[in-house]
Amino acid sequence: ALQTDYIDLYWLHRDDLRFSPGEIVERMNQWIRQGYIRYFGVSNWTAKRIMEANEYAASHGLSGAVASQIQYGLGICTPSDWGDSTIVCMDNSEYMAYEKLQIPVYGYSAQAEGYFPLYIRGGSGALGSDTRKKYDTPVNRIRADRLKQLMKKKQYSLSWIMAEYVLRSSFPAMFIMGGSNESRMKEIMGQYNCGKKQLTDEEWEIILKTTP
């Protein structure tokens, strides 16, 4: 179906806690030796499990996980907010672990399902029920209010701000984003290609302060 002899990067989409990290590493390396895949990454694994897997791989002369995919963006949320205990969301402990791991992190839901532009325009009442459940928290409201204040002083792309938040990480990181129309996608990719920062470090400090 894929019309290819091998997969460059094979993603394990969910962790399976019935198996030890070492068992999973062994199976992935079997596929690498057989030529089915070149590398493997993990999606919705905790950093702790990734560390265990990669430590096992290193001690046995095997290939470990080369990339991770978790929920990561300016919009803070939790698995409980999503109603799904099998996903992993970026938090302080995960962030510090990735600073040690230094493997690429692909952040999904980096746009927080449009939470910030919707909230800035119309408050909580402008949000759909699913977005409200996942993202309408005190921390995210504070961040939205600060973005709104900055918008009064300078013009910038909210879509690109969402991407810039992930790209400014202290480890390799990439955003996974979508757009409702072609112009939005061109806007995001245009900003990415020019590589220009919209916010200063001082402005980011204002947005990310944990107190009102």
Regions found by a protein language model. Give the residues of each.
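Active-site groove signature of glycoside hydrolases
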Residues: A1-S20
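Beta/alpha (TIM)-barrel catalytic core signal, keyed to glycine-rich beta->alpha loops juxtaposed to Asp/Glu
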Residues: D15-P212
